[in-house]
Amino acid sequence: EAHCQAVGRAFVRFDYTGHGESSGRFTDGTIGRWHADTLAVLDGIAAGPQILVGSSMGGWQMLLAARARPERVVGLIGIAAAPDFTEDLMWQQFDDAAKIKIQAEGILYLPSDYEDTPYPVSLGLIEDGRDHLLLRNPLTLNCPVHLIHGMVDTDVPWQTALSIAEVATSDEVSVTLVKGGGHRLSAEADLARLTAAVENMAVRVHD
């Protein structure tokens, strides 16, 4: 945001329903609902061609948005992008006891690496996620894509970036792997790398 302000580029950011300052309960959120949030911002607030930057689940959302609005999205930058995480990194990793519990109670609490309290995963999140999986078939993208992923990410394996590159139909897909980088990529060097990626993409598609 500071970089965009400094160079005079328009910038929009938002919290999904149930996140940050937005209303709603996190446990009521689903990939589909957050996709609707993304399209509402893209259609109702952001004007003109857009470069989307998404981190983790936001990376899944940017890919969905680019597929839904190909005429609006001219570039994508993913940071530890996590498409299909509800299926590949949650459901398929749950043991039988966890699967039985979430199916019976509708919610499962998992330990968090970032908070003292566990975070909730709803059955609705898992089931709805199956309607939005992207890595099982070719993913139609008509714009440049730059994926940045830390190689010691313990939440989303770096191989996910390669999977995205493999299914994306765009001829312009690049992957930057950060040796020693974790999931959040929030160190000063990581932010400088992201800033450079944003500026390079902006110059490439806009200027």
Predicted regions, residues:
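Alpha/beta-hydrolase fold nucleophile elbow
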Residues: 45-56
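Hydrolase active-site cap/lid region
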Residues: 71-121
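Catalytic active-site module of serine/aspartate enzymes centered on a nucleophile-bearing elbow/loop
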Residues: 181-207
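Conserved alpha/beta-hydrolase
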Residues: 1-23
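Short beta-strand/loop motif that positions the catalytic acidic residue
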Residues: 140-141, 147-149, 153
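Catalytic nucleophile-loop/oxyanion-hole region of alpha/beta-hydrolase
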Residues: 19-47
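Catalytic histidine neighborhood in serine/cysteine hydrolases
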Residues: 168-184
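Conserved alpha/beta-hydrolase "acid-adjacent" motif
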Residues: 154-160, 186
